[in-house]
Amino acid sequence: MRASGFFISTLKEAPAEAELISHKLMLRAGIIRRLGSGLYTWMPLGLKVLRKVENIVREEMDAAGALELLMPAVQPAELWRETGRWDVFGPQMLKIRDRHERDFCFGPTHEEVITDIARREIKSYRQLPLNFYQIQTKFRDEVRPRFGVMRAREFVMKDAYSFHTDIPSLEETYQAMHVAYCRIFDRLGLKFRPVKADTGAIGGSSSHEFHVLADSGEDAIAFCSDSDYAANVEMAESLPPAGLREAAAGEMQKVRTIAQKTCEEVAAYLNVSIEQTVKTLAVMANGGMHLLLLRGDHHLNETKVRKIPFLSDFRLASEEEIRTETGCLPGFIGPAGLSLPVIADLTVATMSNFVCGANEEDYHLVNVNFGRDLKEPDHVFDIRNVVSGDLSPDGKGKLEICRGIEVGHIFQLLTKYSEAMKANYLDESGQARPMEMGCYGIGVSRIVAAAIEQNHDERGIIFPAAMAPFQVVIIPIGLKKNAEVRAEAEKLYATLSSVGIEVLLDDRDDRPGVMFADMELIGIPHRVVVGERGLKEGNAEYRGRRDEKSEVVPLPEIADFIKSKLAGG
């Protein structure tokens, strides 16, 4: 491709609305252009990148035995009413009505549609298992679409759905999809981690997320560097503290802590470690108030709490509710002297001689011990977020916390949708049974933004080779003025193109500095400069996008040199 025949539209500065570095660079590089809130046009340069991601996804899905189809983007409300999701999915669903006043939605996901296809087409156990996928545009009406295509309202997604006679068959496909996803992200050249995750609103059983590692990631990931353990922080566990409680030291005392409400403030005021404080959270659930106890430096994990049956509908108690039950304000409540159910975190259950609220404004208790000064907790659960340094639950090291951008998610849905929509098959005995289902999604357009978040510098994008719009750019210096420069550049362009290498010949009539800046911004992995001075010495100049310096390569060797670089040499 010649730059003169391509559309390169770069910007010196990013528009003011861009916040994330990927959003800024995608706009500056001419990869996308904003049409409206959360709506973006993929420009020719960006579409080349997007298609490369799609192709790798498609190749690996095909290799894993999935079958591609394409479902309608617009879906009738009747299907969503069958599963009960029409009224509960929320305002993210864009609902529309046709000229006959019939309700439809622009699909945010396709569980209902694919299940409808399955119940119409699949009759016998002999037809199973089957795994269908599509790569299609979705729409979710985000409240505040931000960060460019990272969280756009309209986006490209690969969604797959599998159907099975039993759980072992589902697990086999689930593992095949897990392997396929790892291959996809490996081929794309991304640093990523698959992590155990919550099933969320889609529902079901097992669930794993795939995160591209990036400091700007919205999600916190806990992983062990000494093992394969990794989980989203909302699901991550750690080994509980070992050993028995220390013996009580001194009598419990009530001390005045005027205006010291947070554990940080109380610890500093009393000159004790924050690890020796306990914070008490009052929550309403199951028709009454419960007290949750956490170590002062730990944070509540709401996902874990909601998995406790009698706390599944919990909410934080209001100030008025707390005052009514305890007689004091939040910040000073504690478990002592109250008849409310107490749920302690595993870490708190082993503590002794701790500090907690005295249920009296401006007072705390010190040297508090379970069994002596207050009753043992009614229940002990893991209800906190893990932190760096916690022991990995597999006992093979300590946990570390990093940030990640979710780009893939796989679920075992079981029979949630097949039962609701009566998607049954006939087994060997002729009995109708609901199909077991799996669901497997990849944010195709989001991958591009995530890759840029992970791969950039002060000059622009550094695309992994598999995603770059072009593999090599040739920049001739003085192309219009020097026939020899033009001839050598054209010769190299023809040689590399003839063996299937994607080459961009920057034949624009522009200053070298502008061409260098544009190509670094766009993120093409390999650059060759052909100039008059180099030609006099029989050389070209090569520089990889990640390289700090250029290197001189003899002209007769430059084509083979580039081929070697592309082959990983």
From Swiss-Prot:
One of its GO terms (cellular component) is cytosol. Its EC number is 6.1.1.15. It is an enzyme of class 6 (ligase). It is found in: Cytoplasm. It comes from the Bacteria. Keywords: Aminoacyl-tRNA synthetase, ATP-binding, Cytoplasm, Ligase, Nucleotide-binding, Protein biosynthesis. One of its GO terms (molecular function) is proline-tRNA ligase activity. PROSITE patterns: AA_TRNA_LIGASE_II. Gene3D superfamilies: Anticodon-binding domain (3.40.50.800), Bira Bifunctional Protein, Domain 2 (3.30.930.10), YbaK/aminoacyl-tRNA synthetase-associated domain (3.90.960.10). GO terms for biological process: prolyl-tRNA aminoacylation. HAMAP family: Pro_tRNA_synth_type1 (MF_01569). PANTHER family: MITOCHONDRIAL RIBOSOME PROTEIN L39/PROLYL-TRNA LIGASE FAMILY MEMBER, PROLINE--TRNA LIGASE. Homodimer. Consists of three domains: the N-terminal catalytic domain, the editing domain and the C-terminal anticodon-binding domain. Catalyzes the attachment of proline to tRNA(Pro) in a two-step reaction: proline is first activated by ATP to form Pro-AMP and then transferred to the acceptor end of tRNA(Pro). As ProRS can inadvertently accommodate and process non-cognate amino acids such as alanine and cysteine, to avoid such errors it has two additional distinct editing activities against alanine. One activity is designated as 'pretransfer' editing and involves the tRNA(Pro)-independent hydrolysis of activated Ala-AMP. Belongs to the class-II aminoacyl-tRNA synthetase family. ProS type 1 subfamily. This is Proline--tRNA ligase. It comes from Nitrosospira multiformis (strain ATCC 25196 / NCIMB 11849 / C 71).
